[in-house]
Amino acid sequence: VTSEPGARLDDLVLHLAALAGTPTLFNPYADTDPTVDGSDAPAIRRGNLGRYLRAFMDRDEIDLWLGEAPSRFGARRTGVPFSGEGYLADLSSRLAIAPFGIATDEALATRPSSTSRQIWSALPARLPLFWNAVMHHPHRVGTPLRNRTPTRSEITRHREALTLLIAAIRPRRILAIGRVAEGAAAGYDVPITYVRHPAQGGAAQFRAGVAEFGRDAS
């Protein structure tokens, strides 16, 4: 059994890559989208996620911000939750790590999702760790760039990844962004705070919830 934290994080990335995708669930760590990806895109995304996770390895009092699933313009393309290509340079700078790789061949998604814009605008100075209840991109049949809510069975299949993450990182608190994330976060010995998901008119409530979450830490 692997016990060293860095090796456990590497195992986590490999675990996500080994989880098979489906016709409506794109695995960014193993699968290639021929319309936008370079041939080595899955390896780049695995490298991005591994580098991102290792940046938190020696940090104390980490807050975990848990979302629902990747968006079409976020981790589906980059491998890093809540982070499309347009945020990668800022993220690597704030984490003081080497630049992330670009896995796609075209620049469409310098355009962020509305959810990621709200999340990035609400970030505290001390960065939280981003994760999703489902780390593969759920989409509709025949429309790979149309987001959908993950199913209960998909969340269950990805629970082991969340368990591995929590064991390796040991977050002090979880900010659950939306009810799907709140349900996925249950059952761990980590305090959970629910905030309204910023989509579909929830932006103001989301910002207020994040602000209160930040005050509770002080």
Regions found by a protein language model. Give the residues of each.
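A polyanion-binding, active-site-adjacent surface
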Residues: S3-L175, A181-Y188, T193, Q200
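A polyampholytic, Gly/Pro-enriched intrinsically disordered region
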Residues: E212-S218
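Polar low-complexity intrinsically disordered regions
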Residues: V1-E4, S218
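Short, charged, surface-exposed secondary-structure boundary motifs
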Residues: R140, Q200-A211
